[in-house]
């Protein structure tokens, strides 16, 4: 792990009570030797029907935004959204610097009914197109019941099963207590993936992150940073929204997992 610390002040007068800010930059090591992981292929299929307006859609979009920072420029990411129709805000392709993806996320809003089948089928098409015969993971998030298009459970399970023949794994995340649990379980069963229940949009984002972790090669797990101020420091504050715990003479910041060459910034 490489660390670089920068202060906003070079000199502080003794007993001045000055506030000093510290920017700590961390970079995880790269993979050893010549071994590099293959580009990950992730396709997200997101319900944007009217019922997702309770905050679930926003939380899911924020989760996707945070995932962009964990993906490498050559990783593939695509997003298909559905209500009573299907849109492709992010055509499956390389992440690049993430700017275009984040811009597209800001323009996604809730719509009408729930044509889940069209969203699933379009997502599979995108994943197959972009993966170039490599493995891909499709994650479908929904909070409701399919009420337009194909709604038959065995048929949709068969659609997901057909995707596995193209090296596409299909997982599902059901949000809240009103979604069709049997349908999403059937789809994930057919697609050879996982079926998750999320109490709310924030939990859905956590499950989505968990699915992505399986695609990425982690070089550091359960990382933490110990902060122990000297006697000359009267107080310290972490501006990042990260879990912390008190220890003797300081506190510990939980950083979690870091992938190859991932960069983090902490502001104190």
Question: Where are these predicted regions, by residue range?
Answer:
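Extreme N-terminal starter segment of soluble prokaryotic enzymes
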Residues: 1-4
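An acidic, Ser/Thr-enriched
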Residues: 22-24, 32-43, 224-227, 233-268
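Exposed acidic/Ser/Thr-rich ligand/metal-binding surfaces
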Residues: 6-222
